[in-house]
From Swiss-Prot:
This is Tryptophan synthase beta chain. Tetramer of two alpha and two beta chains. The modification N6-(pyridoxal phosphate)lysine is found at residue 86. Keywords: Amino-acid biosynthesis, Aromatic amino acid biosynthesis, Lyase, Pyridoxal phosphate, Tryptophan biosynthesis. Its cofactor is pyridoxal 5'-phosphate. Transmembrane segments: none annotated. SUPFAM superfamilies: Tryptophan synthase beta subunit-like PLP-dependent enzymes. The keyword Lyase applies. Belongs to the TrpB family. Pfam families: PALP. It comes from the Bacteria. CDD domains: Trp-synth_B (cd06446).
Length: 396
């Protein structure tokens, strides 16, 4: 029986209760079989094109890098049906679940984008859907909560722990432990127990594949760097995957520095965490001196995660990708900047990557460079929270 690698270097693996091992084995084999089946691939690609709206545009910014020699392109995952890159892999996993004969889908969500994507895929494919969401996130993402309910999903607020994404993840896994015979756990990021990091990456890798073709058609060469925000890491690994072998292309992931890396309110485990076991995997993790999981923090709910996908950890360890961080204030500034300069309302998550790219351009205005930012989602979900933050700062 064919098997996928469970580890990326020392990271990854399958640290789960024994009861879940058969379910994960079944999922791995189903994924291997599906990837080898032209009919499955064809149905997936048809849904991406005709339902989700792929390929997404590659947009050259007109004003963000004025006064510099940088050309900055945006990969427009915000234009995808559902409003973010999440729709790509959700359609893939939902098709896989149907192929496995599952009737129900369990999901977790932070910003609500994965929950919305899961709800729309379940509505389309006739699957029952329940979504676990931290109670804090339910409050700060009420438009997405209503969207999910509108599409027939049951939204279950999680009040344990910090009432955020990590707690929703734990509850979703607990549910799956009891229901895996009928239910598929549709994990929302390129993290968690094997084979999820590989499945999610492969169902997101068209982001980088399209970007490569589009930039070659437009510029006749590969970019100097591709830049993406990193929470769990699915939009970033989707962008990076097709460029890993292209050694001339820098892969830059941007973690949330929150209120500052020197505070305890950030979400940057790659640079400031220690290796631990969390969410069924071995990965960098924000921990206190006793090894307890620390609460992460970010202004963007989708980056508020105390760990990171194992492939990012490996790419960081071997020096193939580099990871920096951006504070809440810098992301908020970029959120406003792209709206004013380009007429695009970007997600707060994506605004972290954008802030880093704009800084790269203006730090060295004479340097000729070709940059691509993965604009992973649109910011409609964030306008109310940003309005309140700016009002509080007296910036409105």
């Amino acid at each position: 029986m064919a098997k996928l690698d469970a580890y990326f270097g020392e990271y990854g693996g399958q640290y789960v209760p024994q009861i879940l091992v058969p379910a994960l084995d079944q999922l791995e084999q189903a994924f291997i079989d599906a990837q080898a089946d032209p009919e499955f691939r064809s149905e997936f690609m048809t849904l991406l094109q005709e339902y989700a709206g792929r390929p997404t545009a590659l947009t050259l910014t007109r004003n963000l890098t004025k006064g510099t020699k940088t050309k900055l392109y945006l990969k427009r995952e915000d234009l995808l049906h559902g409003g973010a890159h999440k729709t790509n892999q959700v359609l893939g996993q939902a098709l896989l679940a149907k192929r496995m004969g599952k009737q129900e889908i369990i999901a977790e969500t932070g910003a609500g984008q994965h929950g919305v994507a899961t709800a729309l895929a379940c509505a389309l494919l006739g699957l029952k859907c329940r979504v676990y969401m931290g109670a804090k996130d339910v409050e700060r993402q009420s438009p997405n909560v209503f969207r999910m309910k509108l599409m027939g999903a049951e939204v279950i607020p999680v009040h344990s722990g910090s009432s955020t994404l990590k707690d929703a993840c734990n509850e979703a896994l607990r549910d799956w432990s009891a229901t895996y015979e009928d239910a598929h756990y549709l994990l929302g990021t390129a993290a968690g127990p094997h084979p999820f990091p590989t499945i999610v990456r492969d169902f997101q890798r068209m982001i980088g594949e399209e970007t490569k073709n589009q930039i070659l058609a437009r510029e006749g060469r590969l970019p100097d760097a591709v830049i993406a925000c990193v929470g769990g890491g699915s939009n970033a690994i989707g962008m990076f995957a097709d460029f890993i072998e292209e050694e001339s292309v820098r892969l830059i992931g941007v973690e949330p520095a929150g209120k500052g890396i020197d505070t305890d309110q950030h979400g940057a485990p790659l640079k400031h965490g220690k290796t631990g076991i969390f969410f069924g995997m071995k990965a960098p993790l924000m921990q206190d001196e006793n090894g307890q999981v620390e609460e992460s923090y970010s202004v963007s709910a989708g980056l508020d995660f105390p760990s990171v996908g194992p492939q990012h950890a490996h790419l960081n360890a071997i020096g193939r990708a580099e990871y920096d961080n951006v504070t809440d204030d810098e992301a908020l500034e970029a959120f406003q900047l792209i709206a004013r300069k380009e007429g695009i309302i970007a997600a707060l998550e994506s605004s972290h990557a954008l802030a880093h790219a704009v800084k790269m351009a203006h730090d060295d205005p004479e340097k000729e460079q070709l940059l691509v930012v993965n604009l992973s989602g649109r910011g409609d979900k964030d306008i109310f929270s940003v309005h309140d933050i700016l009002k509080e700062k007296g910036a409105l």
